[in-house]
């Protein structure tokens, strides 16, 4: 609808037209500030230009039946859509059902490689991982809905010092809790009940002879054993959030290609030796300084592994590569992009989205840390507390790059202060009305819209605006727009519902048709957010 209006106006005016939503609904459904843009060109007041253009648009043959009114107001041109136009779009939308708002694959479709979560398999997923996980999953859903091809991948950091430290931590816990030895722990180690659980499970699962081997052998075996257990638990946690990956890439397997990658970096004159280390000349590409890839002891840095992994990704020739990282990785972006340039790739194809910190409260107090995981709040604990859908909604309700703080008790309330409940309640009200209605759904669908007042038309317009919201949410990586849209539409519906009777009016079927459109838009929006909308819900109010 938005695209059609924009196209018609640009054809008439032969200028690029920006379409906005007026802040005041009394000004219409759409507005354009084009008169301000043309004021300097024509050396006229925007007010005069707006009047001239409004007349040109309203009298043009292509807008007949499209608008009820085209009005110049303070330099803006405001448009009110005709009921006939809204009716045609409503009929088409209701026929499309769950495909309403989607786009077919086309020449504009992209092939997107989306990597997210990629948490080290050294512990359970905590709440800090959940935000990026939910965002990435919903972004993929929206991209596919818009006709793009998406591969979702989890990069498993299954080698290196952190994996050995995991094995060492389990070994020390085994000695303390199974062998009942007195153990001195190092300054840095993985702690929490989950480490003790793994140690006890290893005692049951692994051959007793293992624990008679030398310590390095024991630690190596326990590292792999614990890593596999944690990866299974991570997958279970993701499943509980409704998240499923297309592939899991092993750092250990990917890193087997390191020699070929380093050979290409050398040929590109990207490396040099200094202080017995091998450095990447990343400062040539906007990095703050050059970065070490191989340390004095000949071991590789984390960056080296990441470079090899990105080379493997870029070999697959996707249109766009999106990484979702924690905000603390901000300084890491330039060095990875530098390596891509040295390897002959276009680093502009890589977009890195940063997930800011999450702070959970309960009764206005910091949420209790998990004993099982030490100083972390586990995803599973919060899902058990408030449910998957509420957690997903709240994580998507703010821009990814802004800090998020919320009290989980809000998500348990059955009133308008709980946004997800308020939206479910709107849909529940609609389905309850349909059940009570003497009309069949087919009768309602076939009823033409001929007698709607301004408020009813605006509610219908809001429900029909979903496609543009989906599109802009994807283009701007602003998935919070989907949440805001659903909240606003639900609020508008509740206002409509509370304003007067719906079933006991001569135009009941027309009003029910609007309700069906609202329900469809709420349902499709929630589906893209990874939330199942409810058709039945109890209410205290």
Curated annotation (Swiss-Prot):
MF terms (GO), sorted A to Z: arginine-tRNA ligase activity; ATP binding
PROSITE patterns cross-referenced by the UniProt entry: AA_TRNA_LIGASE_I
Presence of keyword Lipid metabolism: no
Disulfide bonds, paired cysteine numbers: none
InterPro entries: aa-tRNA-synth_I_CS, Arg-tRNA-ligase, Arg-tRNA-synth_N, Arg-tRNA-synth_N_sf, ArgRS_core, DALR_anticod-bd, Rossmann-like_a/b/a_fold, tRNAsynth_Ia_anticodon-bd
Top enzyme class: ligase
Assembly mode: Monomer.
UniProt cross-references to PANTHER family, sorted A to Z: ARGININE--TRNA LIGASE, CYTOPLASMIC, ARGINYL-TRNA SYNTHETASE
Membership in a protein family: Belongs to the class-I aminoacyl-tRNA synthetase family.
Record protein name field: Arginine--tRNA ligase
Organism of provenance: Helicobacter pylori (strain Shi470)
């Amino acid at each position: 609808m938005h695209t059609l209006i924009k196209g018609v106006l640009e054809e008439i005016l032969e200028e690029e037209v920006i379409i906005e939503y007026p802040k005041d609904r009394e000004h219409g459904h759409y507005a354009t500030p084009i008169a301000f843009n043309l004021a300097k060109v024509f050396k006229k007041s925007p007010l005069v230009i707006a009047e001239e253009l409004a007349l040109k648009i309203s009298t043009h043959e292509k807008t007949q039946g499209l608008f009820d009114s085209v009005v110049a107001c303070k330099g803006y041109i405001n448009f009110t859509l005709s009921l006939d136009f809204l009716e045609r779009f409503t009929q088409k939308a209701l026929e499309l059902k769950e495909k309403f708002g989607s786009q077919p694959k086309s020449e504009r479709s992209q092939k997107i490689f989306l990597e997210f979560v990629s948490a080290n398999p050294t512990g359970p997923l905590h709440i800090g991982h959940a935000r990026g996980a939910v965002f990435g999953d919903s972004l993929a859903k929206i991209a596919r809905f818009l006709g793009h091809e998406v591969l979702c991948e989890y990069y498993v950091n299954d080698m290196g010092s952190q994996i050995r430290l995991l094995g060492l931590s389990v070994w020390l816990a085994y000695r303390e809790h199974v062998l009942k030895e007195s153990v001195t722990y190092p300054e840095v180690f993985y702690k929490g009940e989950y480490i003790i659980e793994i140690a006890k499970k290893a005692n049951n699962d692994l051959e007793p002879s293992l624990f008679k081997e030398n310590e390095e052998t024991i630690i190596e075996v326990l590292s792999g054993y614990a890593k596999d257990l944690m990866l299974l638990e991570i997958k279970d946690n993701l499943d509980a959030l409704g998240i499923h990956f297309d592939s899991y890439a092993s750092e250990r397997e990917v890193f087997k290609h390191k020699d070929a990658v380093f050979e290409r970096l050398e040929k590109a004159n990207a490396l040099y030796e200094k202080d017995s280390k091998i450095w990447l000349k990343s400062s040539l590409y906007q990095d703050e300084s050059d970065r070490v890839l191989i340390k004095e002891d000949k071991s590789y840095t984390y960056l080296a592994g990441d470079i090899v992994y990105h080379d493997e990704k870029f070999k697959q020739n996707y249109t766009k590569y999106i990484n979702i990282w924690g905000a603390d990785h901000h300084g890491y972006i330039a060095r990875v992009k530098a390596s891509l340039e040295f390897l002959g790739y276009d680093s502009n194809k890589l977009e890195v989205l940063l997930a800011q910190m999450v702070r959970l409260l309960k009764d206005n107090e910091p949420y209790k840390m998990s004993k099982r995981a030490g100083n972390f709040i586990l995803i599973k604990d919060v899902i058990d507390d408030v449910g998957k859908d509420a957690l997903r909604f709240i994580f998507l309700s703010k821009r990814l790059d802004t800090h998020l703080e919320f009290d989980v008790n809000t998500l348990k309330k059955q009133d308008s202060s709980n946004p997800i409940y308020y939206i479910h309640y709107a849909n529940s009200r609609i389905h309850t009305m349909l059940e009570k209605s003497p009309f069949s759904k087919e009768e309602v669908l076939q009823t033409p819209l001929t007698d709607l007042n301004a408020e009813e038309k605006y509610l219908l317009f809001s429900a029909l605006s979903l496609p543009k919201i989906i599109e802009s949410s994807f283009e701007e990586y602003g998935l919070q727009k989907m949440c805001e849209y659903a909240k606003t539409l639900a609020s508008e519906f509740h206002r409509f519902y509370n304003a007067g009777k719906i079933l006991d009016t001569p135009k009941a079927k027309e009003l029910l048709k609007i309700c069906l459109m609202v329900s469809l838009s709420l349902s499709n929006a929630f589906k893209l957010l990874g939330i199942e909308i409810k058709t039945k819900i109890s209410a205290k109010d």
